[in-house]
Amino acid sequence: MSNVDHAEIAKFEALAHRWWDRESEFKPLHDINPLRVNWIDERAGLAGKKVLDIGCGGGILSEAMAQRGASVTGIDMGEAPLAVARLHQLESGVAVDYRQITAEQMAEEMPGQFDVVTCLEMLEHVPDPASVIRACHRLVKPGGQVFLSTINRNPKAYLFAVIGAEYILQLLPRGTHDFRKFIRPSELGAWSREAGLEVKDIIGLTYNPLTKHYKLANDVDVNYMVQTKREA
């Protein structure tokens, strides 16, 4: 059975044409992207690395990593977001290889081929996130790094990521997130270890509605990123 939620794919298909509009529903992704790329680059040294971006969508993270000197492949199951990513490539001139394929299929095809694997803001949109993490382990080279991000599952996360972001501040379209699919750091850590990935670091991402700025912080109550490594 394919690890794809077609309703989730449809959500982003409908919005795909606005992916690179920095004032659209994708503004939060644009705003947090520099923080995420810097955090990954500081730990992995992207220049010259072969990188796979799982759930790449319209290519915001993929292009940013390519601009840091990485050789990037971006994969997604959404046809419209990938079309937008390829179209934006023509405008930006940034080289990324985009493919419509699941992480699990890619792991069968190219095991152990990547220095770095990223899977950001994607795990909470698939039926079986642990399966994606196992695929990440198969895809990354021994000694390589896997970076994951998602949203914690607790009352504060529901208040901030669903009620606050979707209903009050209207940063995201209503229905973007399903609280039941949010993932606690303990769960993400357990799935990573079971897959053969060692958790090296964790950082939170917080939003100040007054200044409208995001920053990295030790608060992992809502959004957070995890650095993991496959044994050499």
Curated annotation (Swiss-Prot):
Pathway: Cofactor biosynthesis; ubiquinone biosynthesis. The keyword Transport does not apply. S-adenosyl-L-methionine binds at R36, G55, D76, L120. InterPro entries: SAM-dependent_MTases_sf, UbiG_MeTrfase. GO terms for biological process: methylation. It is an enzyme of class 2 (transferase). Keywords: Methyltransferase, S-adenosyl-L-methionine, Transferase, Ubiquinone biosynthesis. It catalyses: a 3-demethylubiquinol + S-adenosyl-L-methionine = a ubiquinol + S-adenosyl-L-homocysteine + H(+); a 3-(all-trans-polyprenyl)benzene-1,2-diol + S-adenosyl-L-methionine = a 2-methoxy-6-(all-trans-polyprenyl)phenol + S-adenosyl-L-homocysteine + H(+). Its EC number is 2.1.1.222, 2.1.1.64. Disulfide bonds: none annotated. It comes from the Bacteria. GO terms for molecular function: 2-polyprenyl-6-hydroxyphenol methylase activity; 3-demethylubiquinol 3-O-methyltransferase activity; methyltransferase activity; polyprenyldihydroxybenzoate methyltransferase activity. Belongs to the methyltransferase superfamily. UbiG/COQ3 family. NCBIfam families: UbiG. O-methyltransferase that catalyzes the 2 O-methylation steps in the ubiquinone biosynthetic pathway. This is Ubiquinone biosynthesis O-methyltransferase.
